[in-house]
Amino acid sequence: MRILLSNDDGVHAPGIQTLAKALREFADVQVVAPDRNRSGASNSLTLESSLRTFTFENGDIAVQMGTPTDCVYLGVNALMRPRPDIVVSGINAGPNLGDDVIYSGTVAAAMEGRHLGFPALAVSLDGHKHYDTAAAVTCSILRALCKEPLRTGRILNINVPDLPLDQIKGIRVTRCGTRHPADQVIPQQDPRGNTLYWIGPPGGKCDAGPGTDFAAVDDGYVSITPLHVDLTAHSAQDVVSDWLNSVGVGTQW
């Protein structure tokens, strides 16, 4: 199995390095990751400037000023030959649950892999300690995919409790929960008296009941949520069409 491995925490982050070491026990792994932390970069792509890369002695590649999406795009289309069989993103330092997936560079890297036609996993740890647990879970899933490919055409967003492996209760297939809208901005002043702004923490849990990714991780289970690239709200198409007909928009200007 050939794996393109990326993340949003940066090429030196403990999550990606722990996972790369574990995956190399049974797979051909190419790391292509940002040269610095790009958390929250979502699906952004660098279009107004060129991208430079740096290759370390162990073969890992850092994309200077690159986003997670840049890294996967370059990895698939230029840097990994032959091309990968699968794209894996992570292990992220901290969870990507509920609407976190909208902002997550970890999920975005996997989404770019899927958009380019490859199976893709996004892996996050609900904490900053037991990366070995998340690595073991990921390796188990990838070995299973080698034996029996999962033909859903979906991204698997995997969130792992920050627990020792022997305390993980199992796996639950889940849906994304939701958070309350975030509204905190933290102002500060620089030495010249100019106001600086920091984006505050995410909103608290809103929909975190049974069946959600939040609930699974809180209960000690690995959460696997299938995600897809198509953002169309299919169930709303008829509602929007009926509304347009009702208000006359499009029939007269």
Curated annotation (Swiss-Prot):
Assigned EC number: 3.1.3.5, 3.1.3.6, 3.6.1.11
Co-factor: note: Binds 1 divalent metal cation per subunit.
Localization in the cell: Cytoplasm
Key words of the record: Cytoplasm, Hydrolase, Metal-binding, Nucleotide-binding
SUPFAM superfamilies associated with the record: SurE-like
Annotated a divalent metal cation binding sites: D8, D9, S39, N92
Catalysed reaction equations from the record: a ribonucleoside 5'-phosphate + H2O = a ribonucleoside + phosphate; a ribonucleoside 3'-phosphate + H2O = a ribonucleoside + phosphate; [phosphate](n) + H2O = [phosphate](n-1) + phosphate + H(+)
GO cellular component: cytoplasm
Cofactor needs: a divalent metal cation
Keyword field contains Transcription: no
GO molecular function, one term: 3'-nucleotidase activity
Main subcellular location of this protein, as a coarse class: cytoplasm
Role this protein plays: Nucleotidase with a broad substrate specificity as it can dephosphorylate various ribo- and deoxyribonucleoside 5'-monophosphates and ribonucleoside 3'-monophosphates with highest affinity to 3'-AMP. Also hydrolyzes polyphosphate (exopolyphosphatase activity) with the preference for short-chain-length substrates (P20-25). Might be involved in the regulation of dNTP and NTP pools, and in the turnover of 3'-mononucleotides produced by numerous intracellular RNases (T1, T2, and F) during the degradation of various RNAs.
PANTHER family found in the cross-reference section: 5'-NUCLEOTIDASE SURE, 5'_3'-NUCLEOTIDASE SURE
Protein family: Belongs to the SurE nucleotidase family.
Name this protein carries in UniProt: 5'/3'-nucleotidase SurE
Organism: Escherichia coli O127:H6 (strain E2348/69 / EPEC)
Organismal lineage: Bacteria, Pseudomonadati, Pseudomonadota, Gammaproteobacteria, Enterobacterales
